[in-house]
Amino acid sequence: IIDYYDEGEEDRDVGVVDAR
């Protein structure tokens, strides 16, 4: 599942595979 969130921690677009 893909979680869309705009945290601004990683260097990728919004919508990572729950990689918090």
Curated annotation (Swiss-Prot):
Residues 1-12 have a biased composition (Acidic residues). Keywords: Adaptive immunity, Blood coagulation, Coiled coil, Disulfide bond, Hemostasis, Immunity, Innate immunity, Secreted. It comes from Felis catus (Cat). The lineage of its organism: Eukaryota, Metazoa, Chordata, Craniata, Vertebrata. A long coiled coil structure formed by 3 polypeptide chains connects the central nodule to the C-terminal domains (distal nodules). The long C-terminal ends of the alpha chains fold back, contributing a fourth strand to the coiled coil structure. One of its GO terms (cellular component) is extracellular region. The keyword Coiled coil applies. Its main location: secreted. This is Fibrinogen beta chain. The gene is FGB. Cleaved by the protease thrombin to yield monomers which, together with fibrinogen alpha (FGA) and fibrinogen gamma (FGG), polymerize to form an insoluble fibrin matrix. Fibrin has a major function in hemostasis as one of the primary components of blood clots. In addition, functions during the early stages of wound repair to stabilize the lesion and guide cell migration during re-epithelialization. Was originally thought to be essential for platelet aggregation, based on in vitro studies using anticoagulated blood.
